[in-house]
C-alpha cells in the first residue's frame, strides 16, 4: 500500500512538472507571436504609408498631378494648393571608389500649374576629390520634357528629352501582397525600413532592365525607406529603391520618390 502511494505521489509530481513546463513554453510561444504581430503591424503600416502615392502609379500623364492633392499638415499656408516633387535616378559603381548617378527631379506647382526641374549627372569619389556635378534645366509642357539648357552631347540630349520617371511606367498596386519583409525601425529619428526580394519576372524589374544598362542577372531587392511620421508629413523623407547590387561594396540601383509639400519654398531647398 505504501509503495502504491509513493508511485501515485511520484506520478503527480511528474505531471505537475510537465504542466508547468508546458505553460512556460506556451507563454514563450505567445510572446514570440506577439512580437511577430508587432513587426507585421509596422510592416503593414509602412506599406500603407507608401500606398498613398504608389497606388497612383503608373502616372503616364504627369499633368494629372495638378488635380491631385496629397497629405496636408500645418506646414501649408491657407490657400496653398501644394507642390508635387517627382524624382528618379539610376546609380552605379563604375569602378572601386567611384559612384555615378543620373536622373531627373521635377517640381509640379499646383497653384500655377507649371512644372520645372533639372536633369542631373553626378560622379562621387571616395578619396579626397570633389564630386563632379552638372544640372540641366528642364520644364514640362503637355506632358513633354523640354530641355532649356544647351547640351552638346547628342546622346545626353536624347536621354534628357526622352526621360521617363519610374512612376510613369511602374505598377506597384500588388505591394499589399508582399509579406515577410526584413523590417528595421529607429523610433528615435523616427525612421522605418522594409526590404523585399523581387523576382526577375516582375514587370517593374523587366521595365527597368529594358531602360537601363543593368549587367547582372541577380534578382533585385525592393527597399522602402521613410524618415518621419508614418501617417504622413510634408517635411519627412520617403523613397523607394530597387537594388540590383551584386555585393556589398558595389552599387547598382534605381531610386524613386514622389512627395507632396508646400509650394512656397526657397529655391535653395529644391
Curated annotation (Swiss-Prot):
Residues 1-22 form the signal peptide. One of its GO terms (cellular component) is plasma membrane. It is a lipid-anchor. It comes from the Bacteria. Keywords: Cell membrane, Lipoprotein, Membrane, Palmitate, Signal. It is found in: Cell membrane. Gene3D superfamilies: 2.50.20.40. A lipid is attached at residue 23 (N-palmitoyl cysteine). InterPro entries: Csa, Csa_sf. Its main location: membrane. A lipid is attached at residue 23 (S-diacylglycerol cysteine). NCBIfam families: SA_tandem_lipo. Belongs to the staphylococcal tandem lipoprotein family. This is Uncharacterized lipoprotein SA0405. The gene is lpl9.
